[in-house]
Regions:
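Short alpha-helical hairpin
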Residues: 54-83, 95-96
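Extreme N-terminal leader/anchor segments
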Residues: 1-63, 71
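Short linear motifs in intrinsically disordered/low-complexity regions
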Residues: 3-6, 26, 30, 82, ...
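Aromatic-lined, polymer-binding surfaces characteristic
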Residues: 74-76, 86-263
Length: 263
């Protein structure tokens, strides 16, 4: 890189990626990857041949059958339409941009070694990147459909896992690895510049930034991510919780997920 041979630098990055030992990611255990029956279904539903039916938590197309995800296939039939919004519920749109089907699909790839799942990830995430560019810095992203900080955090946490499941995939090229890492950097920096002022959202955002910093220490901004994320988490121990340990949001579900974020 220092002598200007950027392609060779990228080749070395790929070699490093293939052989690296990842940090301890509490969300990934490669020694025992067994997708559930539902995860296998979600992996297959997301394929082009099944009309890009992307799993979203609690959102199903009743007209297509029992527990069948909605299709995000474009009307022209030749791609994905990320603006499809079947229910009109804001939460559904947010969940679409969390990419909740990608980890189940990655687990299915890892257990089967079927490259069609890796190729689908590359196709779908690559398309998402093109169709959902990051807003300019200074834009109010509090309720942004695809770049709301909470949803960015969910994507970032999952990207850290995806890069482990697909580590040895022959479909992951130098160019694709570079693209994923570039946008991992973009995601972490976006969160740091747009932390929520308070609430469980802020805790999840800090967890995501910390994950990126600790699991990808080779990246240029990793030290800043780790410092930022752990700093916010440390502050949240007192700012987001009552002295008895109860989350100030007051919701049991958020309390449990907030505690999980400190793992």
């Amino acid at each position: 890189y220092d002598i200007g041979d950027y392609y060779m630098a990228l080749e070395e990055l790929m070699n490093y990626y293939r052989s690296r030992t990842h940090g301890l990611n509490p969300n990934v255990d490669l020694s025992s990857v067994t997708p559930t029956a539902n995860e296998l279904r979600w992996a297959d539903y997301a394929l082009r041949e099944n009309d890009y039916r992307f799993y979203l938590n609690n959102y199903y197309d009743a007209a297509a059958g029992e527990n069948v995800p909605y299709s995000y296939k474009s009307k022209s039939g030749d791609g994905i339409d990320w603006t499809i919004w079947p229910t009109g519920e804001q939460e559904q749109r947010y969940q679409l941009h969390r990419h909740q089907w990608m980890v189940p699909q990655a687990k299915t790839y890892y257990s089967s070694q079927d490259e069609k799942y890796a190729l689908n990830w590359i196709e779908v995430y690559g398309d998402w990147i093109k169709q959902n560019p990051k807003p300019e810095q200074g834009t109010d992203v509090t309720n942004h459909a695809s770049w709301r900080p909470l949803d960015v955090a969910a994507r970032l946490i999952d990207q850290c896992a995806l890069l482990e499941y697909y580590q040895q995939s022959e479909s992951v090229t130098i160019e694709w690895l570079t693209e994923v890492l570039k946008h991992l950097d973009e995601h972490a920096n976006h969160i740091m510049n747009n932390y929520s002022a308070d609430s469980n959202h802020r805790i999840t955002q800090a967890q995501a930034v910390t994950f990126a910093g600790m699991l990808f220490p080779e990246l240029k901004n990793a030290a800043a991510w780790k410092t930022s994320g752990t700093g916010v988490l440390g502050d949240a121990v007192t700012s987001e919780y009552f002295p008895d340990g109860w989350l100030k949001d007051g919701d049991l579900h958020y309390h449990i997920s907030g505690i999980e974020d400190f793992r």
